[in-house]
Design a protein with these regions (language model features):
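Conserved beta-strand segments of alpha/beta enzyme cores
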Residues: 2-4, 89-92, 151-153, 275
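N-terminal catalytic cores of NTP/NDP-binding nucleotidyl/phosphoryl-transfer enzymes
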Residues: 12-75
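Residue-level signal for inorganic ion chemistry
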Residues: 30, 83, 122, 183, ...
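Short acidic-hydrophobic, aromatic-tinged amphipathic segments that line or gate anion-handling sites
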Residues: 2-11, 71-74, 92
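Glycine-rich, Lys/Arg-enriched anion-binding loops that position phosphate/diphosphate groups
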Residues: 137, 143-246
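N-terminal Rossmann-like or analogous alpha/beta NTP/dinucleotide-binding catalytic cores
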Residues: 62-148
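A short acidic, often aromatic-flanked loop/helix-cap motif at beta-alpha or helix-coil junctions
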Residues: 11-14, 98-101, 159-163
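Phosphate/ribose-recognition catalytic cores of enzymes acting on nucleotide-derived substrates
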Residues: 200-313
Length: 313
């Protein structure tokens, strides 16, 4: 069954109701989130119901703290792809507006989950809070489930080898510290930036290493610098490469973007959507005294990146 995206919760058709659904923000869909979705999947199988994920767009933080720097770990499109790969049937995108924010926990359950979505089962994380003032708790959700005739399961916390709890915040912290490997450990896959390839100054092409340039818009900004990468093309191919994340101080750029040199690749990608995984942090961004010195360093970056993402080539 192909993933269906449902916007909103009012006046839904019968086929969009009656799911066993995981409830949460699920930014990044990390391994802790995956445990919540697995709980919903068990219920969906037992109830012979569609497997759903209930989340919010925009993220609640965007409504309450509109001036806060970008923090998202994935776009809705990326989230939908990951969830589809996990077997999710329906992704409910609930508009998080002032009406939604005004609902008490009881109103949210009764008006949105029961009347709107007609849920048969809700799975949530051990630390879930919902409703105005974040008054809803796992215990409250269980009580509301009993009162309204839907099942509830609460996923236990998922911890790593060091006993740390998996969270979206820990992923963001790892990325800001230049530790994409740690971010990937928590996510269960590499962190990736997706966007439309835009034209740059063409300097890289003139110097022999053309780059695919993508602006960083709503994503959390990882530590600026150079990364070994893998890029997924629109046709599904994956190409190793090396990328500069930053504003290129040598050439005086001011916008933060990801400029990726795809190894052994010379096709036109302008206007196309690509997704670039950050595999390993190689070095901070540097300002060079000359273009020649910059080229020498890029060649060293290439050798280091190839050893990581394209060994033997």
């Amino acid at each position: 069954m192909k993933l269906k995206i449902v916007h909103g919760w009012k006046d839904l058709p019968a086929q969009a109701r009656g799911a066993a659904a995981a409830l949460g923000n699920f930014d990044g869909v990390h391994r802790g989130h995956q445990q919540v979705i697995a709980e919903a999947a068990k219920a969906a199988s037992a109830l012979k119901a569609p497997l759903g994920v209930i989340t919010f767009d925009p993220h609640p933080r965007r409504l309450f703290r509109p001036t806060e720097p970008a923090f998202r770990l994935m776009t809705i499109e990326q989230q939908a792809r990951v969830l589809s790969g996990m077997g999710v049937d329906i992704l409910y995108l609930l508009p998080f507006d002032f009406q939604m924010a005004s609902f008490s926990d009881k109103e949210f359950v009764e008006q949105v989950l029961v009347e709107g979505l007609g849920v048969k089962h809700v799975a949530a994380g051990f630390d879930i809070s919902f409703g105005k003032g974040r008054t809803g708790s796992p215990e409250a959700l269980r009580d509301y489930g009993q009162q309204n005739g839907f099942g509830v399961s609460i996923a236990a916390p998922v911890a790593g080898r060091a006993g740390d709890k998996f969270s979206s915040t820990s992923v963001r912290d790892a990325l800001r510290e230049g530790q994409p490997e740690e971010a990937a450990r928590i996510l269960g896959r590499p962190f990736a930036i997706e966007g439309v390839v835009r034209r740059g100054q063409q300097l890289g092409r003139q110097l022999g290493f053309p780059t695919a340039n993508v602006e960083i818009v709503d994503y959390v900004v990882p530590k600026l610098g150079v990364y070994a990468t893998r890029t997924r093309l629109p046709d599904g191919r994956e190409v190793p490469g090396v990328a500069n994340l930053g504003n290129n101080p040598t050439t005086g750029e001011v916008e933060t973007r990801l400029e990726t040199w795809l190894f052994d690749f010379d096709e036109d990608l302008y206007g196309q959507v690509i997704e670039t995984q950050l595999i390993a942090f190689l070095r901070p961004e540097l300002k060079f005294d000359s273009i020649e010195l910059m080229v020498e360093q890029i060649r060293r970056d290439e050798a280091q990146a190839r050893a990581i993402v394209a060994p033997g080539f």
